[in-house]
């Protein structure tokens, strides 16, 4: 017997009162899975999400304005988790340089502990998500802003070498360094990394600030 193509999708009955939140969560979860499978926001469509959940496309629009809004919400939850992770790691660290180093280490640990969310945030094509890399969007990112503010504290405390006076530029450079290693560790787990990976990551957090911090 030949299967019908395209395959039919079992449709849900109309949601009862109180089920809307559960459906919204299912839609977000399906979108996240599609992002991971395709590696591109462009490849994710409202129709594909609807088929994955088992609803009609109009059901998606009752919860999200459009595809961009849907993908934004998927990313927003993970960005909030990253923001909280960095805040906890740097809490109580008085020296601003040590705090910045702690944030870099926390960023890498977050990526290694949560490789799939990390891929969604930083390693998929996401031109229509919060990661458009426009300055106005980037500055609104809470996790990035923590790094920028800490870099400014380092400047104000005279902890950086002369010439390093732009906290925004420094924060981008620091982010680029920690992201570089994190993305490699996530994308290339079979590479012969040092056996003591935790110590290696810890060392790298200090290397990221080499040449910037003033000698004491």
Regions of interest found by a model, annotated:
Residues 1-22, 33, 187, 216:
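N-terminal intrinsically disordered/low-complexity leader segments
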Residues 24, 46, 68, 72, ...:
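Short, structured helix-loop boundary elements
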Residues 26-33, 52, 69-91, 102-109, ...:
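Alpha-helical structural segments
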Residues 38, 67, 89-96, 114, ...:
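Short coil/turn helix-boundary motifs
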Residues 129-137, 155-204, 215-216:
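Hydrophobic/aromatic-rich alpha-helical bundle segments in the mid-to-C-terminal region
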């Amino acid at each position: 017997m030949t299967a019908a193509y395209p395959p039919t999708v079992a449709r849900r009955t109309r949601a009862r009162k109180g089920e809307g939140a559960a459906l919204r969560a299912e839609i977000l979860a399906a979108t996240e899975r599609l992002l991971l499978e395709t590696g591109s926001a462009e490849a994710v469509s409202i129709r594909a999400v609807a088929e994955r959940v088992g609803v009609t496309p109009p059901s998606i629009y009752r919860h999200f304005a459009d595809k961009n809004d849907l993908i934004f919400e998927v990313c927003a939850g993970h960005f909030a988790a990253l923001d909280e992770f960095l805040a906890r790691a740097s809490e109580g660290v008085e020296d601003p340089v040590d705090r910045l180093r702690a944030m870099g280490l926390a960023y890498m640990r977050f990526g290694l502990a949560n490789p799939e969310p990390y891929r969604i945030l930083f390693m998929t094509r996401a031109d229509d998500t919060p990661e458009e890399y426009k300055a106005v969007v980037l500055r609104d990112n809470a996790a990035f802003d923590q790094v920028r503010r800490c870099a400014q504290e380092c400047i104000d405390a005279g902890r950086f070498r002369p010439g390093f006076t732009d906290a925004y530029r420094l924060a981008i450079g620091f982010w680029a360094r920690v992201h570089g290693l994190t993305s490699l560790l996530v994308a290339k787990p079979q590479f012969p990394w040092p056996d003591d990976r935790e110590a290696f990551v810890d060392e790298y957090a200090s290397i990221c600030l080499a040449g910037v911090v003033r000698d004491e």
